[in-house]
């Protein structure tokens, strides 16, 4: 049986420094975080961007994990080269193969703490269920968006993203650091419980399923000519109903939510998403029954069956 190994990543975006700082302190004092004896690799995702104090150098690292990127490595593209390096080092067939990847991020949006799952892989949903059951975190299921692909955790058999906010880029914050530490330790504890078959899975999982993303209002030249309405700003996870305010223009014009069914907005006014033409994303809150296939997939993965 292969040894269970977990990849822990901070600084996938170089200006999200709270996880990086926590990892640096952890390396100085190994007792700071309890990994329950599980072998972990603590990695700074994008060290070049960290040095530069930027989100990325050439291309968003968290959109660079695509098969074609690994086949045709561009030495002039820092992030695609780094994605290939990480997979070669820690991927399933890498030098230090890890079964689970946990990627720690921060956001400028008022998201609080949440888990992001990409697609519907059974092991991901099982682990997300465990952490939601322990900490009550919302789970954002990101899928069916062809404009946003190539996420880091998708290159591992099981992987979750942790998002914590709000926090400005390049700033340290005690609450963000404490939340990161708490979630990391809880995840490691739950993985340990699965390893020892001493676990309790919930019957339900609350999912916020991605529907679509919307852009800011723009003029004929493509420039942003409106901003998030004051009644919508910082209202992540709060239900949007028809005719609710979305955006406002300086002339007083209000752009309203026009969908017939209610949605839950997330990542409202996230600073890093402006370049991606995303003002916010819409989700639908759903209550899913926990499936035994999820549980078995996670157990089999951790026990290398």
Curated annotation (Swiss-Prot):
Cofactor note: Binds 1 zinc ion per subunit.
Keywords: Hydrolase, Metal-binding, Zinc
Organismal lineage: Bacteria, Bacillati, Cyanobacteriota, Cyanophyceae, Synechococcales
Cofactor(s) named in the record: Zn(2+)
Binding residue positions for Zn(2+): 13, 16, 105
Parts forming coiled coils: none
Family: Belongs to the AspA/AstE family. Aspartoacylase subfamily.
Recorded GO MF terms: aspartoacylase activity; hydrolase activity, acting on ester bonds; zinc ion binding
Name used for this protein in its record: Probable aspartoacylase
Residues the entry annotates as binding substrate: 55, 62-63, 163, 273
Protein species of origin: Prochlorococcus marinus (strain NATL2A)
InterPro entries, alphabetized: AspA/AstE_fam, Aspartoacylase, AstE_AspA_cat, Aste_AspA_hybrid_dom
Cross-referenced PANTHER family: ASPARTOACYLASE, SUCCINYLGLUTAMATE DESUCCINYLASE
């Amino acid at each position: 049986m292969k040894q269970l190994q977990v990849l822990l990543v901070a600084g996938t975006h170089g200006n999200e420094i709270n996880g990086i700082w926590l990892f640096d302190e952890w390396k100085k004092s190994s007792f700071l975080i309890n990994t329950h004896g599980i072998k972990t690799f603590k990695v700074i995702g994008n060290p070049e961007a960290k040095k530069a104090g930027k989100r990325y150098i050439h291309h968003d690292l968290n959109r660079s994990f695509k098969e074609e990127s690994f086949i045709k490595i561009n030495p002039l593209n820092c992030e695609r080269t780094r994605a290939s390096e990480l997979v070669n080092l820690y991927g399933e067939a890498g030098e230090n193969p890890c079964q689970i990847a946990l990627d720690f991020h921060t956001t400028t949006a008022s998201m609080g703490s949440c888990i992001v799952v990409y697609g519907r892989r059974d092991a991901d949903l099982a682990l997300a269920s465990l952490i939601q059951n322990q900490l009550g975190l919302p789970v954002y299921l990101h899928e069916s968006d062809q404009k946003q692909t190539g996420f880091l955790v998708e290159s591992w058999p099981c992987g979750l993203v942790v998002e914590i906010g709000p926090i400005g880029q390049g700033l340290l914050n005690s609450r963000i650091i404490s939340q990161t530490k708490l979630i990391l330790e809880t995840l490691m504890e739950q993985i340990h419980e699965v390893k020892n078959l001493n676990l309790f899975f919930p019957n339900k999982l609350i999912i916020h399923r991605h529907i679509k993303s919307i852009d800011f209002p723009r003029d004929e030249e493509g420039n942003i000519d409106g901003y998030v309405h004051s009644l919508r700003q910082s209202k992540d996870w709060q239900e949007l109903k028809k005719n609710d305010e979305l955006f406002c223009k300086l002339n007083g014009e209000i752009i309203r939510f026009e969908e017939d069914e209610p949605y839950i907005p997330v990542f409202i006014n996230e600073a890093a998403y402006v370049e991606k033409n995303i003002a916010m994303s819409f989700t639908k809150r759903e209550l899913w029954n926990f499936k035994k296939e999820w549980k078995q997939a996670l157990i089999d993965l951790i026990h290398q069956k």
